[in-house]
Amino acid sequence: MTENRRIKRVNALLQEAIAKVILKDVKHPKISNLWITVTRVSLSKDLHSARVYVSVMPHENTKEEALEALKVSAGFIAHRASKNVVLKYFPELHFYLDDIFSPQDYIENLLWQIQEKEKS
Protein backbone atom coordinates (compact mmCIF):
# COMPACT_ATOMS: atom_id res chain seq x y z
CA MET A 1 0.00 0.00 0.00
CA THR A 2 2.81 2.41 0.87
CA GLU A 3 4.64 1.60 -2.37
CA ASN A 4 1.49 2.28 -4.38
CA ARG A 5 1.06 5.65 -2.66
CA ARG A 6 4.71 6.47 -3.33
CA ILE A 7 4.38 5.67 -7.04
CA LYS A 8 1.27 7.86 -7.28
CA ARG A 9 3.11 10.71 -5.61
CA VAL A 10 6.15 10.33 -7.88
CA ASN A 11 3.83 10.14 -10.93
CA ALA A 12 2.30 13.49 -9.95
CA LEU A 13 5.72 15.08 -9.38
CA LEU A 14 7.00 13.78 -12.71
CA GLN A 15 3.91 15.00 -14.55
CA GLU A 16 4.38 18.51 -13.20
CA ALA A 17 8.14 18.60 -13.83
CA ILE A 18 7.90 17.20 -17.38
CA ALA A 19 5.09 19.62 -18.27
CA LYS A 20 7.20 22.58 -17.09
CA VAL A 21 10.21 21.43 -19.09
CA ILE A 22 8.15 20.98 -22.26
CA LEU A 23 6.57 24.39 -21.80
CA LYS A 24 9.68 26.38 -20.92
CA ASP A 25 12.80 24.58 -22.12
CA VAL A 26 12.05 22.49 -25.22
CA LYS A 27 12.71 24.59 -28.33
CA HIS A 28 12.01 22.01 -31.03
CA PRO A 29 10.51 23.71 -34.14
CA LYS A 30 7.79 21.08 -34.58
CA ILE A 31 6.33 21.72 -31.14
CA SER A 32 7.07 25.39 -30.55
CA ASN A 33 3.61 26.58 -31.67
CA LEU A 34 1.58 23.74 -30.19
CA TRP A 35 -0.23 23.36 -26.93
CA ILE A 36 1.06 20.15 -25.37
CA THR A 37 -0.51 18.87 -22.18
CA VAL A 38 0.97 16.07 -20.10
CA THR A 39 -2.23 14.25 -19.15
CA ARG A 40 -0.69 11.53 -16.98
CA VAL A 41 2.49 9.68 -16.14
CA SER A 42 2.62 5.96 -15.42
CA LEU A 43 5.79 4.89 -13.64
CA SER A 44 6.97 1.28 -13.68
CA LYS A 45 7.17 -0.53 -10.34
CA ASP A 46 10.97 -0.52 -10.41
CA LEU A 47 10.91 3.27 -11.10
CA HIS A 48 13.25 2.90 -14.10
CA SER A 49 10.83 3.80 -16.90
CA ALA A 50 7.81 6.03 -17.25
CA ARG A 51 5.06 6.26 -19.83
CA VAL A 52 4.25 9.91 -20.43
CA TYR A 53 0.84 10.50 -22.02
CA VAL A 54 0.39 13.78 -23.87
CA SER A 55 -2.40 15.59 -25.65
CA VAL A 56 -1.51 17.88 -28.55
CA MET A 57 -3.61 20.80 -29.78
CA PRO A 58 -4.70 22.57 -32.04
CA HIS A 59 -5.17 20.15 -34.93
CA GLU A 60 -4.96 16.48 -35.81
CA ASN A 61 -2.22 16.44 -38.45
CA THR A 62 0.47 17.75 -36.07
CA LYS A 63 0.09 15.08 -33.38
CA GLU A 64 2.41 12.45 -34.85
CA GLU A 65 5.10 15.04 -35.64
CA ALA A 66 4.85 16.44 -32.12
CA LEU A 67 5.08 12.95 -30.64
CA GLU A 68 8.22 12.23 -32.67
CA ALA A 69 9.74 15.54 -31.56
CA LEU A 70 9.05 14.65 -27.92
CA LYS A 71 10.61 11.22 -28.39
CA VAL A 72 13.73 12.84 -29.87
CA SER A 73 13.83 15.30 -26.96
CA ALA A 74 13.15 12.66 -24.26
CA GLY A 75 16.73 12.63 -22.96
CA PHE A 76 16.85 16.42 -22.71
CA ILE A 77 13.44 16.51 -21.01
CA ALA A 78 14.51 13.83 -18.51
CA HIS A 79 17.76 15.66 -17.76
CA ARG A 80 15.98 18.96 -17.08
CA ALA A 81 13.14 17.36 -15.10
CA SER A 82 15.64 15.44 -12.95
CA LYS A 83 16.78 18.76 -11.50
CA ASN A 84 13.30 19.25 -9.99
CA VAL A 85 12.47 15.66 -9.02
CA VAL A 86 15.29 14.03 -7.10
CA LEU A 87 15.29 10.24 -7.47
CA LYS A 88 18.09 7.71 -7.15
CA TYR A 89 17.48 6.70 -10.78
CA PHE A 90 15.53 9.06 -12.98
CA PRO A 91 13.20 7.03 -15.22
CA GLU A 92 13.61 6.70 -18.95
CA LEU A 93 10.73 8.60 -20.57
CA HIS A 94 8.51 7.04 -23.24
CA PHE A 95 5.95 9.36 -24.85
CA TYR A 96 2.49 8.30 -26.05
CA LEU A 97 -0.50 10.17 -27.43
CA ASP A 98 -3.42 10.21 -25.04
CA ASP A 99 -6.88 10.05 -26.59
CA ILE A 100 -8.58 11.37 -23.48
CA PHE A 101 -9.57 14.55 -25.34
CA SER A 102 -10.51 12.91 -28.65
CA PRO A 103 -14.12 14.26 -28.80
CA GLN A 104 -12.84 17.73 -27.96
CA ASP A 105 -10.03 17.30 -30.48
CA TYR A 106 -12.56 16.45 -33.16
CA ILE A 107 -14.64 19.56 -32.45
CA GLU A 108 -11.51 21.70 -32.23
CA ASN A 109 -10.33 20.34 -35.56
CA LEU A 110 -13.69 21.13 -37.19
CA LEU A 111 -13.61 24.68 -35.84
CA TRP A 112 -10.03 25.07 -37.05
CA GLN A 113 -11.02 23.93 -40.56
CA ILE A 114 -13.97 26.34 -40.64
CA GLN A 115 -11.70 29.18 -39.57
CA GLU A 116 -9.17 28.31 -42.28
CA LYS A 117 -11.91 28.20 -44.96
CA GLU A 118 -13.21 31.61 -43.88
CA LYS A 119 -9.72 33.09 -44.18
CA SER A 120 -9.29 31.93 -47.78
UniProtKB/Swiss-Prot annotation:
Q: What does this protein do?
A: One of several proteins that assist in the late maturation steps of the functional core of the 30S ribosomal subunit. Associates with free 30S ribosomal subunits (but not with 30S subunits that are part of 70S ribosomes or polysomes). Required for efficient processing of 16S rRNA. May interact with the 5'-terminal helix region of 16S rRNA.
Quaternary organization:
Monomer. Binds 30S ribosomal subunits, but not 50S ribosomal subunits or 70S ribosomes.
> Subcellular location, in the record's words?
Cytoplasm
By sequence similarity, the record places it as follows: Belongs to the RbfA family.
Q: Which superkingdom heads the taxonomic lineage of this protein's source? A: Bacteria
Q: A single Pfam family, by name? A: RBFA
Positions of transmembrane segments: none
Assigned keywords, A-Z: Cytoplasm, Ribosome biogenesis
Q: Name one GO biological process term.
A: maturation of SSU-rRNA
Q: Which GO terms describe its molecular function?
A: ribosomal small subunit binding
What is the protein named? Ribosome-binding factor A
Query: GO CC terms on record?
Result: cytosol
Q: What HAMAP family does this protein's entry cite? A: RbfA
Q: What is its main location?
A: cytoplasm
